[in-house]
UniProtKB/Swiss-Prot annotation:
Principal location class: membrane
Keyword Transport attached: no
Cellular-component GO terms for this entry: plasma membrane
Name this protein carries in UniProt: Uncharacterized membrane protein YoaK
Organism: Escherichia coli (strain K12)
Induction of expression: Constitutively expressed, may be induced at pH 5.5, repressed by thiol oxidant diamide (at protein level).
Transmembrane annotation, as ranges: 3-23
Length: 32
C-alpha cells in the first residue's frame, strides 16, 4: 500500500544522489 508512495520517493532520492555524486565527482576532481 505505502509502496506506491515510498517507491517513487526512493527513485527520486537515488537520482538526486547520483546526479550530485556525478556533478561533485566531475568538478571536484577534473583530472581524475
Amino acid at each position: 500500500m505505502r509502496i506506491g508512495i515510498i517507491f517513487p520517493v526512493v527513485i527520486f532520492i537515488t537520482a538526486v544522489v547520483f546526479l550530485a555524486w556525478f556533478f561533485i565527482g566531475g568538478y571536484a576532481a577534473p583530472g581524475a
